[in-house]
A protein has these predicted regions:
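Bacterial N-terminal signal peptides that target proteins for export
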Residues: 1-8
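C-terminal motif of bacterial Sec signal peptides marking the signal peptidase cleavage site
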Residues: 15-18
Length: 186
């Protein structure tokens, strides 16, 4: 019992020191002011495309309070064509990863269009990754990592999110990947 009390006192003392420390507060403010996802995209050589128009009766994004919901999007290339095919037969895991990464770039373009300034992203909350895959394919997370790795590279800690990575028997237009997402914004 004495050991528990000593540990609690030590933890309380440490938290009081860190809470009252102006250096700790400044460090937090520095991290916030250094957050510049658009500069990060530039440094990575990524140029955001113009968001594509929805192909049916829906919109690319809907804001509800401080949440922005993005519709499912796919790996649309600069030439206007999608990366298509099934991972496990037509595409390798690496090609699927690149399709998911491209889908992430397209989703960031929609974020930019909706928000004007990507530094308004407070947190990527959730992504649902759907992989067009053969029935025996089991590496869906490795494919959707293309999206998740990009979000963390661009948004840092704010890019870490919850996620589903599932296989589908087919996707619209035979696209390789479709990903939708929920984002908390400022």
């Amino acid at each position: 019992m004495k050991k528990i009390i000593q540990t609690l006192i030590l933890c309380l003392g440490l938290s009081m020191v860190s809470c009252g420390s102006p250096q700790g507060q400044n460090k937090s403010e520095e991290v916030k002011s250094d957050f510049n996802p658009e500069a990060k995209l530039d440094s990575m050589g990524i140029v955001l495309p113009q968001p594509s128009a929805p192909v049916a009766n829906f919109v690319n994004s809907v804001q509800v309070g401080n949440l922005l919901f993005l519709s499912g999007n796919g790996p649309l290339k600069q030439d206007g064509k999608f990366i298509t095919g099934k991972v496990g037969s037509d595409l390798t895991i690496e090609e699927g990863y690149e399709a998911a990464r491209l889908t992430g770039i397209n989703q960031i373009a929609i974020l930019k269009s909706a928000l004007g300034d990507l530094s308004r992203v407070k947190r990527i909350i959730r992504a649902a990754g759907m992989v067009n895959a053969t029935p025996d394919f089991k590496q869906h997370p490795a494919v959707v990592n293309g999206f998740s790795d990009l979000m963390v590279a661009v948004f840092g800690e704010r890019g870490k999110h919850t996620r589903a990575a599932v296989g589908m028997v087919s996707l619209p237009f035979n696209i390789a990947v479709e990903i939708d997402m929920i984002v908390e914004i400022e």
